[in-house]
Amino acid sequence: MSTPTQSLQVKLLDPRFGDLWPLPAHATESSAGMDLRAALEAPMTLQPGDAALIPSGIAIHLADPQLCAVILPRSGLGHRHGIVLGNGTGLIDADYQGPLLISTWNRGREAFTIEPGDRIAQLVILPIVRAGLQVVDTFVDSARGAGGFGHTGVR
């Protein structure tokens, strides 16, 4: 388990944390994310194409306007079972204090059952840059220019 470099306020909204489930934590020194669990009362089966908002059982308060949190999918669930986030990425602003809900979508071909306590997403804390927009008529040339999708090729 890694050593935290910053404190994060968390409210436990589900009494199973601490007893049955550990708090979200970085699994290794190099882990960027902390796993979020499905704080369900009973197993939930998502049929192909189904989406659901699944409670994580926690609320966080970043408090620092220079930070945000993102909820990201777990790679194995998406690759092996087609279980991904319904909104792509969940963005948590520094002043949000409500429960973290995980928008979960079964894009796979088979039904998938999520059990209470399953690790279904991950939470990553990120610094943000608050940029002001500067309107210009032209940009300074870059090597890429306006080349868009597929412009740099695959090899």
Swiss-Prot record:
Its cofactor is Mg(2+). Keywords: Hydrolase, Magnesium, Metal-binding, Nucleotide metabolism. InterPro entries: dUTPase, dUTPase-like, dUTPase-like_sf, dUTPase_trimeric. Its EC number is 3.6.1.23. GO terms for biological process: dUMP biosynthetic process; dUTP catabolic process. HAMAP family: dUTPase_bact. This is Deoxyuridine 5'-triphosphate nucleotidohydrolase. It comes from Xanthomonas oryzae pv. oryzae (strain KACC10331 / KXO85). The lineage of its organism: Bacteria, Pseudomonadati, Pseudomonadota, Gammaproteobacteria, Lysobacterales. The gene is dut.
